[in-house]
Amino acid sequence: MLFRSKSSPDEEVRRSIYIKVKRSLIHPLLSMHDFADTDSSCPVRFATTVPTQALSMLNSEFINQRADAFAKRLMTEEPTSVTKQVALGLRLVTQREPKAAEIRRALTFMNDLQANEKADPNQALTLFCLMALNLNEFVFLD
């Protein structure tokens, strides 16, 4: 017999982050994403989506460091092909096989960065990773 959760379907699709929190030092990224007030109880959590959340996911030092580390992982695991790096990146982020059109769009994005913005291939891959970490499929659960 398989283990069955007693949680409702809405509760089963939640992601949680468990970290040690010092009440006076709340991580800025978590505060942007409705982190609970550490000075009072929180019986009900409200979900919000506001522009500052998206901006923090694009501009925060932490997320940019994660994108850089992700790009290095892709270069290590698929050193011979940018197409394979993109496919692996999308597969890891979305947890499904990427569609050919998604891979083409990502490659076009990276080529445009190199041609128009004079980004080197590593910078283009890092920016692709930043974009991938901001996909709705990664940030939100359906």
Regions found by a protein language model. Give the residues of each.
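An acidic, gly/pro-interrupted, aromatic-rich
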Residues: 1-93, 97, 132-142
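Extracellular/periplasmic catalytic domains that process cell-envelope and extracellular macromolecules
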Residues: 8-11, 119-124
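Short, well-structured alpha-helical segments
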Residues: 87, 99-107
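Short, charged, surface-exposed loops that flank catalytic or proteolytic processing sites
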Residues: 80-82, 115-122
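Globin-like tetrapyrrole-binding proteins
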Residues: 128
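Amphipathic alpha-helical segments that form the core helices of the histone-fold
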Residues: 93, 106-115
